[in-house]
Amino acid sequence: MLEAGIDIIEISRLERSIKRHPRLLARVFTPAEVAYCLARHRPGASLAARFAAKEAVMKALGIGLGRCSWQDIEITREQGGRPRVILHNRARQLARELGVGEITVSLSHCHAYAAAVALVESSFSEEG
């Protein structure tokens, strides 16, 4: 079975939130995600794309907010630049329980918005 999740976020909204609540970076993103994004030309856009990806993964898994930590879903990059999802702790456990085989994600951003789509392939179906 294939499940999809999508999310879009206004980049400036996330930037304002981080400015008001600096601890948000450490609460939502892994140290590796923060380091990567802060080294980019537009750190806010990179952070927002990863935020959207985490939300899209949660939606595709059907777990919603609060079932795992934001940091349990990490967005990295393969050598060729393709984004990759790594699940940790509770998110990994939930994915196993759901029979998740593979998660793919696509990120995009423009001047004002960042968006992500996640596809989750699982071996379980509601039909049995």
Curated annotation (Swiss-Prot):
Please give the cofactor(s) recorded in the UniProt entry for this protein: Mg(2+)
| Residue positions binding Mg(2+) | 7, 55
State a single Gene Ontology molecular function. Answer: holo-[acyl-carrier-protein] synthase activity
Q: What class of enzyme is it?
A: transferase
Q: What is its EC number?
A: 2.7.8.7
Coiled-coil spans are none
List the GO biological process terms.
fatty acid biosynthetic process
InterPro entries for this protein: 4-PPantetheinyl_Trfase_dom, 4-PPantetheinyl_Trfase_dom_sf, ACPS, Ppantetheine-prot_Trfase_dom
Q: Does the keyword Magnesium apply?
A: yes
Give the keywords, sorted: Cytoplasm, Fatty acid biosynthesis, Fatty acid metabolism, Lipid biosynthesis, Lipid metabolism, Magnesium, Metal-binding, Transferase
Pfam families for this protein = ACPS
Top-rank taxon of the source lineage equals Bacteria
What is the catalytic activity of this protein? apo-[ACP] + CoA = holo-[ACP] + adenosine 3',5'-bisphosphate + H(+)
**So which residues are the signal peptide here?**
none
- SUPFAM superfamilies xref list: 4'-phosphopantetheinyl transferase
Alphabetized Gene3D superfamilies for the sequence: 4'-phosphopantetheinyl transferase domain
Q: Where in the cell is it found?
A: Cytoplasm
Lipid biosynthesis listed as a keyword: yes
Q: Name one GO cellular component term.
A: cytoplasm
Give the family from UniProt: Belongs to the P-Pant transferase superfamily. AcpS family.
Question: What is the stated purpose of this protein?
Answer: Transfers the 4'-phosphopantetheine moiety from coenzyme A to a Ser of acyl-carrier-protein.
Descriptive protein name: Holo-[acyl-carrier-protein] synthase
**Which species is the source of this protein?**
Moorella thermoacetica (strain ATCC 39073 / JCM 9320)
Gene coding for it: acpS
